[in-house]
Amino acid sequence: MIKVYIGLGSNLDVPQSQLKKAIIAMEMVPSTSVVKTSSFYRSKPVGPQDQPDYVNAVVELDTELSASVLLDYLQAIENEQGRERKIKWGARTLDLDILLFGDEIINNDRLQIPHVEMHNRGFVLLPLNEIFPDCMIPGVGAVSSLLQEDNADDLVKLI
């Protein structure tokens, strides 16, 4: 089994419910199990600010799937929950990002793992640190150190 960390985000159609539905859907992915779920956090949007705040979380999975097959399942979950890919950084019902996939480094047309912006985003670092406090991002460093550098003060823990 490979340890995988997934970033979840939503700011449309009752975001907390969207995240809960996505976690249940991830439990149905073949050869994959949900191990841990972080608390949910409210955060300001990245990009255009004329949209609702986001609700974010991180989930730890164990999987036997390849990263690309897992991505297919995650994108299917996004689509089932009404995800539309119209505007970069636009409002969305659901965003599921593979943050880390074991110790693999992947850089192709479909995937960049570790997720290319995760080290700059408090809304990823704080929930990731909550469920994986010893996390090291390959080529970047310890999540706990990055959190000290990043301003995660604007995050509000919801549940």
Can you annotate each of these PLM segments?
Residues 62:
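Glycine-rich and small/hydrophobic secondary-structure elements
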Residues 1-32, 38-44:
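N-terminal beta1-alpha1 ligand-phosphate binding loop
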Residues 20-26, 70-77:
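Short amphipathic alpha-helices in soluble, non-transmembrane regions
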Residues 14-18, 69, 135:
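Secondary-structure boundary/capping motif
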Residues 36, 45-54, 65, 71, ...:
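Flexible, gly/pro- and Lys/Arg-enriched active-site loops
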